[in-house]
Amino acid sequence: MNVTAPELSERQRRILRLVVEEYVTTGQPVGSKALVERGGIDVSPSTVRNEFAALEALGLLMHPHTSAGRVPTERGYRLYAGSVLERMEARPGAFPLDLTSVRREVDDALQATTEMLSRVTSLLALVSAPPLETTTVRRVEVLLLQPDVVMVLVITSTGGVTKRVAAFDNAVDPGLAAWASEYLNDRVAGLTLGSGLLRQRLADPELAAQERRFLETLRPAFSGAAEDEQRLYVGGAAGLFDEVREGEFASYRRLLEILEQRAALLELLRGSLDPRRPFVRVGAELEHPELSNVALVGAAYGLAYRTLGTVSLLGPVRMDYDKAIRSVHSAAAELSRFVEDVYDEH
């Protein structure tokens, strides 16, 4: 989040913070008299109005035509969120995510994280799965469903399960299906999805012609598993419109449309990623003109030596940044501890 902070007095910073937090809570423009009456600043309403004018001149507040109050601009939100990042310290237990009861599967942990994040923040939660090059084949099962129908199960190191069904022109020899299971678990299990070595093992020239043809028919199960691993877990879409204010509906509708474009969302998350600390992108920083009223808050999770993915929240620019930033930071830390344990086991 690259925000060139204007020179503000301590009082101006305080007033900006109070305006943002009040507007986030109420969705209504904030007036000088109301700000003083609610406490938090010991100056007169006229002094607050003067500071409002100064902050407006700096492009941090704006004055809606129908109200005497002020609301934050995108730049104001960015500056406020930047101040939250600067003063943020990890708070143990700040986010109620407990993965101790989750099965030792990364997929389950990612799903649990999105569900809890969306429930706690009332925002759209996005968690990206580990990249393909970190995912291996754990086990393969080749099952004869009917004399001429075979189902292949590919179970990955993240706990993902891909099923593919192949129909043959003639009955399949049960011995061939049993051989395929044994061969794949012996020669393919442990290999990285999408790797050249995996593809070579599926087309080993030393195999008999019948065996190679059979494995060729099963190949889509492995390419399908690779595609499935490019996953984005989403939570909270059903409640996305619960607190939308007038003027925000168009951006929210567009947000739901973009949810259908998982590849674009994954690219957005990768482009925003900062492995060192939580990140915030507001409005135009998302580089989607239709998302001018939307903000993204996220944090990286992973192993000590590499980043595996992101834990993110999407919502209105009028969001509780303090809560959102602390939530993704705590959730990413907990998820990192989980995957460290799981990857150590493998």
Where in the sequence are the language-model features?
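Residue-level marker of regulatory loop/turn positions in helix-turn-helix DNA-binding domains and
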Residues: 8, 28, 244
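Short alpha-helical segments that sit at the start of domains
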Residues: 1-17
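Intrinsically disordered, acidic Ser/Thr/Pro-rich low-complexity regulatory segments
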Residues: 78-87, 91-312, 316-346
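N-terminal helix-turn-helix
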Residues: 19, 25, 29-84
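Short, conserved sequence motifs enriched in acidic/basic residues, glycine, and aromatics
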Residues: 6-7, 42, 71, 171
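A short glycine/serine-rich beta->alpha loop
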Residues: 2-4, 61-66, 318
